A protein has these predicted regions:
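Short, well-structured beta-strand/strand-turn elements
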Residues: 60-67
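Glycine-rich phosphate-binding segment of PLP-dependent enzymes
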Residues: 1-59
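Conserved PLP-enzyme active-site core in the AAT-like
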Residues: 9, 18-25, 29-32, 55, ...
Length: 274
């Protein structure tokens, strides 16, 4: 097992250097650990936190907020923020996990479905897995067309028996999608995937990623929240869904959680490697 442990340690060290560089480049200092109350306007710590996450994940912009109730809520904001009536969403690795099925509208009671993407007029389809295990690249190429607005790429296998997606697989998916429709948004559910590799999905061709701070990037100590990162326009649209149009990423008091989130991110590469 020595070679495997060496591989994990190499990934840990690479990602730790990446996080440290983001802290250094953005001049993280004690004044960024404090927050403001009320509307949360002009919160310097929140702005720097967003910039640090954006650099770590190689994004144009990041939205790091404790107001996300869960990973599912974070993903829902990204989906609802970037999809409107008549748009089409395609899940590329079979059905997503249970809570996301309720967000999309393929599961849940009638009231849940009424509030879902499908209930709001978004079209949905999914690419079945090969033998319930692997992405069907040929079928993906067949199903993506000019009407496909967004593809959902669930990186982790969740509670299913399929394989989690490697960076190589995510890159191949994005290449196929962009070749068929350059305007299609490649959105990666990055929950449980942060810092398990030297690359993150945006480096492999994705346009948008989202995840939970109570999982990998929170280092096991962040108490709540999530993040969305990627192209600036897509992130800001997601922010409009989290708060409101006209507020977007400019508002939202952080309740003195900056320091813990900075600390969690600092610890994350080491904690994930363990």
């Amino acid at each position: 097992l020595e070679k495997e442990f060496e591989r994990v340690n190499d990934i840990r060290d690479f990602n730790q250097r990446k996080v440290l560089k983001a802290f250094f480049d953005n001049k993280v200092a004690p004044e960024h650990f404090y927050t403001v109350s009320g509307y949360g306007h002009d919160d310097l710590g929140r702005e720097v936190l967003d910039k640090v996450f954006a650099q770590v994940f190689c994004a144009e912009k990041a939205l790091v907020r404790i107001h996300f109730a869960s990973g599912t809520h974070t993903l829902a904001c990204a989906l609802f923020g970037n999809l409107k009536y008549g748009d089409k969403l395609l899940s590329v690795a079979g059905a997503p996990y249970d809570t996301m099925q309720e967000v999309i509208g393929t599961a849940g009671d009638e009231e849940t479905k009424r509030s879902s993407l499908i209930g709001n007029g978004v079209l949905y389809d999914e690419v079945p897995l090969v033998n319930g295990m692997d992405v069907d690249f040929a079928k993906l190429e067949e199903m993506v067309d000019e009407k496909t607005t967004m593809v959902l790429i669930q990186r982790s296998k969740g509670y299913s028996t399929r394989k989690s997606l490697s960076m190589q697989t995510i890159g191949r998916i994005c290449n196929i999608v962009k070749a068929k429709n350059p305007d299609c948004i490649c959105f990666v559910d990055n929950c449980y995937g942060e810092f398990v590799d030297k690359q993150e999905p945006l480096e492999a061709g994705a346009d948008l990623v989202a995840g939970s701070l109570i999982k990998n990037p929170g280092g096991g100590i962040v108490e709540a929240g999530g993040y969305i990162a990627g192209k600036e326009l897509l992130v800001e649209r997601s922010a409009n869904r989290l708060t409101a149009p006209g507020i977007g990423s400019e508002g939202g008091a952080m309740f003195n959680q900056h320091r813990l989130i900075f600390q969690g991110l600092f610890m994350a590469p080491s904690i994930v490697s363990e």
